[in-house]
């Protein structure tokens, strides 16, 4: 579907046993009529993280730092964020709030310019995190923004300059760089597009942020990078082993994340991968070292599933590999007891609740916002199809001896998010009491204010840089926002019952305090 001249497309490069082939289809720039070719430069989004991690390890090999160092050793002004180590930043166990959610809650819009310094200022303004460092895993762009700043402080160079000198140039990645300034010229760059009913529109990307994102590259350059893991030109065997060290939460076995890469078994083989998505850009790099195989997928179309393309190529190319195992799926059906164990309410993100019910024969899904329940087909006793066309599914542990403690929201081959079970209490909204919630609410951490008002019988939050956000009550003093900037709002009261403030929970950024002031 991408081999056309009226839509964005895909650049794909494959390496097997040292031989590389590539294919490009679609348009890099619809306005200029420029097709994608092997020199087209794409934004690689979160694929950037493994380069940032590698830069940190190069500095460790130089004796300039250790990944066991506390962050405050290199960024003293971050000491108040807690006893966070560089390793915890690398493996998403730091507990830092997510920078994207913080910026959105502070009033930043998708089309706004976002710079490294603005992100750093926002992160340093935080007074607490989502959890104590080292006690949980939670994906965090914030950690990699701070790692990029560590590279700058320790090396005396920007992340772009350091990587250009130490990684890109030695590997011959001539079309690769970190874009840390929107003023930088990038010949051959692809534009970003999203689908509409009649075609595509541009999706602006105004990041000048390097570290968690910001890498501009080609599919063939990514394969040069992939080859370096098995035949090092930059780094050595010890450094490559360091890159494979999977993160660990206290008291648990090592997780799947390892310094900008994910380790997953697939068809009987170990795979190392990472994807990315920003605006309309999609990326995925998959390595299967035992098969001497790598595939890089880059796209400027928001509807492309880059992970599915990458694994689909692996399925075709490696079908005859001696260790390759065909896909299998359990045929068992869920029992009534299992269905009862699965039924309940689960919170994927703050105030985003999946309600699962059963009639004893199958499961039903709804979001708890007046939506009609949807029957969930069950390919197996633990897997339920939410949207087969997008390969979205809900998965549960097989134990039926007690109610499930969580469900897994599987996003195709891109990974699985965990939604813990919650207990919703019987609740009846009382709009007569909403006036006591109005007023101005100020956040020192976000350096912003919201005005809460009653408008046409609804509680509405207003901000000078965002459209009005409707607040829908679903528990006592607890509201869900119509915009992710205010995803979940919980009002705080003193001993006399007076509203003193609110607590804001956003995706991956929780417990942000606002103080109430009178209108």
Residues covered by each model-derived region:
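Active-site-proximal loop and beta-strand segments within enzyme catalytic domains
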Residues: 4, 8, 16, 25-141, ...
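Catalytic loop of the DD-peptidase/beta-lactamase superfamily, centered on the K-T-G motif
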Residues: 1-23, 152, 157, 164-165, ...
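Short, polar/charged, Gly/Pro-enriched helix-capping and turn/loop motifs at alpha-helix termini
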Residues: 66, 103, 174-177, 236-239, ...
């Amino acid at each position: 579907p991408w081999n056309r001249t009226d839509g964005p497309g895909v650049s794909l490069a494959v390496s097997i046993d040292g031989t590389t082939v590539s294919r490009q289809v679609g348009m890099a720039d619809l306005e200029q009529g420029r097709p994608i070719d092997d020199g087209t430069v794409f934004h690689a989004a979160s694929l950037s993280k493994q380069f940032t991690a590698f830069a940190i390890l190069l500095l460790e090999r130089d004796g300039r730092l250790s990944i066991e160092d506390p962050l405050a050793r290199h960024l003293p002004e971050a000491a108040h964020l807690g006893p966070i180590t560089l390793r915890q930043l690398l493996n998403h166990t730091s507990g830092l709030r997510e920078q994207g959610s913080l910026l959105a809650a502070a009033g930043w819009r998708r089309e706004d310019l976002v710079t490294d310094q603005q992100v750093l200022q926002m992160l340093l303004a935080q007074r607490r995190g989502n959890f104590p460092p080292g006690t949980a895993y939670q994906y965090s762009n914030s950690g990699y923004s701070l790692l990029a700043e560590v590279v700058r402080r320790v090396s005396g160079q920007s992340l772009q300059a350091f990587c250009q000198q130490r990684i890109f140039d030695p590997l011959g990645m001539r079309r690769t760089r970190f874009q840390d300034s929107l003023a930088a010229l990038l010949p051959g760059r692809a534009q970003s597009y999203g689908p509409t009913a009649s075609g595509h529109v541009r999706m602006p990307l105004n990041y000048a942020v390097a570290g968690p994102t910001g890498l501009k590259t080609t599919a063939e350059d990514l394969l040069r990078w992939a080859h370096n893991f098995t035949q090092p030109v930059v780094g050595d065997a010890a450094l490559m082993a360091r890159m494979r060290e999977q993160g660990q939460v206290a008291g648990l076995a090592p997780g799947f994340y390892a310094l900008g890469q994910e380790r997953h078994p697939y068809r009987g083989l170990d795979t190392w991968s990472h994807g990315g998505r920003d605006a309309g850009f999609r990326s995925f790099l998959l390595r299967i070292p035992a098969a001497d195989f790598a595939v890089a997928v880059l796209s400027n179309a928001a509807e492309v599933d880059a992970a599915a393309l990458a694994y689909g190529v692996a399925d075709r190319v490696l079908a005859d590999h001696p260790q390759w195992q065909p896909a299998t799926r359990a045929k068992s059906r869920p029992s009534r007891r299992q269905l009862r164990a699965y039924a309940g309410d689960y919170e994927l993100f703050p105030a985003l609740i999946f309600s699962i019910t059963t009639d004893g024969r199958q499961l039903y899904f709804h979001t708890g916002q007046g939506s009609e329940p949807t029957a969930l087909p069950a390919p197996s006793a633990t897997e339920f199809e939410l949207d087969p066309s997008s390969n979205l599914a809900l998965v549960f542990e097989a134990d039926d001896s007690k109610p499930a403690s969580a469900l897994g929201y599987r996003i195709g081959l891109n990974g699985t998010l965990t939604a813990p079970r919650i207990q919703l209490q019987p609740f009846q909204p009382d709009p007569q009491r909403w006036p006591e919630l109005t007023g101005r609410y100020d956040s020192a951490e976000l350096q912003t204010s919201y005005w809460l008002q009653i408008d046409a019988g609804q509680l509405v939050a207003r901000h000078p840089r965002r459209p009005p956000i409707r607040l829908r009550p679903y528990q006592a003093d607890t509201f869900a926002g119509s915009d992710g900037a205010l995803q979940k709002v919980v009002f705080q009261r003193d001993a006399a019952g007076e509203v003193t403030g609110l607590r804001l929970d956003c995706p991956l950024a929780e417990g942000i305090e606002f103080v109430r002031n009178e209108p």
